[in-house]
Amino acid sequence: MTRKRPALAEPVSSSRSRVTRRSTTGAPSSKKKRSPEPESDADSEDDYDGPSTSQTKKLKRGNSSTNRGKAANKTKRGSFQVKQEIMDDDENEEKIDGEVENGITSREHSPDPSTFKKTAKLQTKKKKKKESPPETPPTSPSPSPSRSVSPSTTKSDISSKKGRKAVVNSVSKVKIEKESTPVKTNGRNLPPKRKKKPVEEETAEEIKLRERAERKARRIEEAKNRPKLTIEQKLAKLRKKKERRERRKEQEKEESMRQKYGQRKIKAEASKWNFGPISSINQRRRDEMMAYFPKANFLAEDGVPKVMNNFRRATVKYNMEVLNPFITCGICDGYIVDATTIIDCMHTFCKSCLLTYFESDNNTCPTCGTFIHGSHPTHYVTYDRAVNELVNQFVPKMENNELDVRKTFLRDCREALGIDTAAEDRERKERLERERITGTNRCYPLERPRFSHHRDDCQVTVNLLPGTANLPLITRPYVRCSEMTTMNTLKKFLSLQIWDDQSRYSDLDMFCDGQLMGKDFSVRFVWMMKRRGQPKSEPLIIRYHMTRT
């Protein structure tokens, strides 16, 4: 017999699959079933995914075994047809997968009732997919009585039922792959977009630290690129830096003094008490005076300070009109006598004027109206030695005239009481002469306080030593004196001990720790400057030199 050539594979769009046609011809008539036609129009065949490759293999092999029979020629032909059909089904599956990915859903409708049934069931599955994926196929719609059921549709119905699960699984796999695969842009696989985390705002302290670190890094980078300086350039740079620092300090000091004293409101109101030492009060007074001085008057026409013109003679010429507001009393409008300063507001008056003002039930400052104390205002005032010495230096012979006036007043008072003042004067002169000859230094209880040599003050021990070899060591180098003793007094004592002439005291200079002491420096001031915090039982060493000419 001549071998028949197998038929070619039908295209995907045919109304019946090859499996269906082969099953209808080979299957017995008892197993054939009618397949009802769908009532509603179905979608195109492209929405339907055929059964998987493994299922089609098993199905086709089973069908081919029934059709083959026992003949050898039929076996060879069936195996070739199975291979051809498997290849066709693989191509169909690839096409269907591509159509599912690209979202192709609309094509021409096919009149095949089996495809109608498949597409209708897929529509119901798509609607119920969010709720629960169906494991079993839904019930088919009722058949229409107008059409006759062909026996070929029964086997296709069975094959469609077997491949329905595979269709659902393939569709779900495609969608899962779509969700899992990264987004494709310009042929590149990009990772999924991440949600932007909220940026935390920096606090003020963090911004400050970051800016400081940036400035430091910038300075380090600039220092690396900067050329190395020579020694002269470094010294000049340090000198300029020091001048800028001093200039800045002076400006800050002037500004603080101007704000403190230049804008004071005259009101009678209580303020904070300031019980500082006398030295701090004097420093504040000096700062206040320097802040109020018009600095333009210190310069001459050539730009050189007037002080430098008279520096060799150690004198300074200045108009008294500028200094008068600082050395006159605000109560009597005269020069201050026995300067007394209010601690809180730093205004100075005469002692007698201020006490008289307090006796008339006044407890505020006469100048600014600052409240001092309700019941004891005299406890919050102090003797201002610095202002008193300034007044005596600016107004010469004023102190001597004041002493003469006091002597005359006391003599008149004693004469009014019937006391012989002439005999007392003769007796006092004789006593002073005897003390000068014998060298005694006793104080009498009936003497006035200013003749008691400040024995009631705090006492300090001073050790006087020669600073050069041409000066001798005095016989009594240890001196116990008041802390208010000045350097001029010590120089007079040394001139009497060395040359027996008090007028030569200007030939000596006093040094402490290698530093020249001013003639008006008190022992207390030198102690606070050089020996602050040390016990006063230890002597203060002061060396005397000849004046350099």
From Swiss-Prot:
Biased composition (Low complexity): 12-29, 145-156
Broad class of the protein's primary localization: nucleus
Species whose genome carries this gene: Caenorhabditis elegans
Residue ranges of the region described as Disordered: 1-263
UniProt cross-references to InterPro entries, sorted A to Z: PcG_RING_finger, Znf_C3HC4_RING-type, Znf_RING, Znf_RING/FYVE/PHD, Znf_RING_CS
Role according to the record: Component of a Polycomb group (PcG) multiprotein PRC1-like complex, a complex class required to maintain the transcriptionally repressive state of many genes, throughout development. Required for ubiquitination of histone H2A. Plays a role in the formation of the male-specific genital sensilla (simple sense organs) known as rays. Required for normal migration of the hermaphrodite specific neurons (HSN) and for extension of some neuronal processes. Represses vulval fates in hypodermal cells that do not normally contribute to vulval development.
Record-annotated disulphide pairs: none
Protein name: Polycomb group RING finger protein 3 homolog mig-32
